[in-house]
């Protein structure tokens, strides 16, 4: 109450911000006549003038009024569109690194040009981020003439683009692309072995279109670059036969083998279920008699079993995925679009493939990953636009430090939002939906029907076909026609069934989108110019009459077939109607069989229903029910926010490590001379090894000199008799031994460098270091994943899982760095070179150097080899056979995950075991 009183007296934070922005709008408007008086050449010259003023020390804020006035006038001349005052406010909000909430049809694409133009003047690049390739190409194509007129270049990043083209696109002043492409390019740039292969510049300023979709809806989905891992494909097929033999529990405490928790999207095996599963697996021969699924040796079986259960119980065809060209393609739960190239992790995708009987592809190993939260926080300045951000304003502020500013509409909204109608069953609900559509169609009112899944959209389509109503279906299966269908959804009597928010980003114009139709005529090569002009003229004459008919019929009518988990998605659907002051209406139809009501509002809602007890086919409209449903949505939003926040808290740990790794990697890539760094690494590696067997401040009796000598020989090819040093000099200590060993290694290394040439050795060192970092980082990511999956169990020991995760991750990262340094030092000091005359080596081009000892690899060949090959050759100079058969013959037992006996430091399965 006190808050409301304060708002009435002082105004809300949003009101105060708008008041400040309106003062700047007045300054921009005052410059309009001056800009209109300029010739095209003079207006274009303003860009060079602004750049010079910035170079002279002026700030972007200082030139904002003039820059916005120039952009507005250029837009009027080039595009025929003049920015409204509210659009100027939106541009300033974006420039200030905030989120502009603007209703559908208010011209967000045009708003972005103001902030993009101003920030592009700094010469550091601006990224405009959209949700798909079509919108990126479309928006860039529409706005490129404006930017070109103002002397700025535009690039577009789309999937399947070659690296050279990507470099050119990123080098442009303004770059359009999708969130996925920008994120993956960042990861790929941090995997290159040559700095000139990088495509991105610094991450300076980003304007994110549909910011809620990208920063909220996709925040739980990390970007992952992966490679194939060792995997048993047959096990997925075998496990796929197990779930049908297990009994699903009706309730959490009921009888059965497993409980499906739809809220948490998890499957939980009961005690009975474990026993039953063990019996089945024992009969199949996968589990030994009296063995347990919980034993360490059977972790893989448990992993595959749970993946199979989740695939059968939680993931459904045409809702969570579709089968396309013999492949499982994920459906985006928020937009209904197909996510080609995306795969579920942890064996789930393979389990779904086994369930559907399609080809099972190997599970992947993570090579690099980042969440959208952490990627977009890398930008110096971030801003965004959407029609619905206010419900998630707290999340934007707390996670991204982005304030949301609600921009007033240019014209008052005239859409009528009717109360929800609630039915007992889904059947009754869909009958009412068809009846409403039929009535709208009779009076010529266009209808957009929103569904939450492909399955429901096809159900509505079948009902409409049965009723004889012509319609278009827009779901993930119709992605190619998406924009065209949405553009014509405002025609007289049009009926469009859309999955979730598919088609978002394309305006629905009452009477139909004339531009799409005229573009289609102009592109028709079968028509002559005269025929094209005649058809376009006829089209333009007929459009106004159709537009007026739709206006009279009540504008676009929105029908929601169920409430979404988030109020924001509902608002997005409603927002498709009533653009720029047009009339429109919306209504949601619900049933007690809908997932939201069934899972989150069932008990109290059912009690209300029983009291009201309507007849079949009669809808309930009641404030109590509406509040109950909104309460359920808030619960789900809160739960989803907590999940995203938890993902971020855990990823923040990995993110700090990622920054260190990528920073070190970048330093190696860009440094001309890494000799000092290499010397430090060799010194540290030797010191650590000596400290292991001669601990500081320990007694001589505690030293293990024979093992130290063996390790030095194996790791660094140093044949030293340290025991004789100790006998010869009683005063010698660990530090003296370190200094002697380091001196020996440095002398030998200097001799090798002299033989092959400094540049060849530097290139070799750089390549070895990068590959060592990449391989060890990949192993570290896998270890972090395993740690993350099991860390929740620490809570049973009264420990905080997050604190435990941070502590263990820090220890693992220290081990990672030590491992990388030791690995590099060991490999580089083990390479031996033939004692050929230096002059002979120097006379030859680097690529032709063949002066390599017969037992050791050629450095130039090593530069092109994989890390496994590098290590294998360098650590096996005498050609010892480390195959499983040879080891067995020598009586050595080496398991796949044991260190390779060659001394490489890699696991056996990744070294000589892999080669075998």
Swiss-Prot record:
Its cofactor is Zn(2+). Its EC number is 7.4.2.8. The keyword Cell inner membrane applies. GO terms for molecular function: ATP binding; metal ion binding; protein-exporting ATPase activity. It is an enzyme of class 7 (translocase). It catalyses: ATP + H2O + cellular proteinSide 1 = ADP + phosphate + cellular proteinSide 2. The keyword Transcription does not apply. May bind 1 zinc ion per subunit. It comes from the Bacteria. CDD domains: DEXDc_SecA, SF2_C_secA. Keywords: ATP-binding, Cell inner membrane, Cell membrane, Cytoplasm, Membrane, Metal-binding, Nucleotide-binding, Protein transport, Translocase, Translocation, Transport, Zinc. Part of the Sec protein translocase complex. Interacts with the SecYEG preprotein conducting channel. Has a central role in coupling the hydrolysis of ATP to the transfer of proteins into and across the cell membrane, serving both as a receptor for the preprotein-SecB complex and as an ATP-driven molecular motor driving the stepwise translocation of polypeptide chains across the membrane. NCBIfam families: PRK12904.1 (NF009538), secA (TIGR00963). Monomer and homodimer. Part of the essential Sec protein translocation apparatus which comprises SecA, SecYEG and auxiliary proteins SecDF-YajC and YidC. This is Protein translocase subunit SecA.
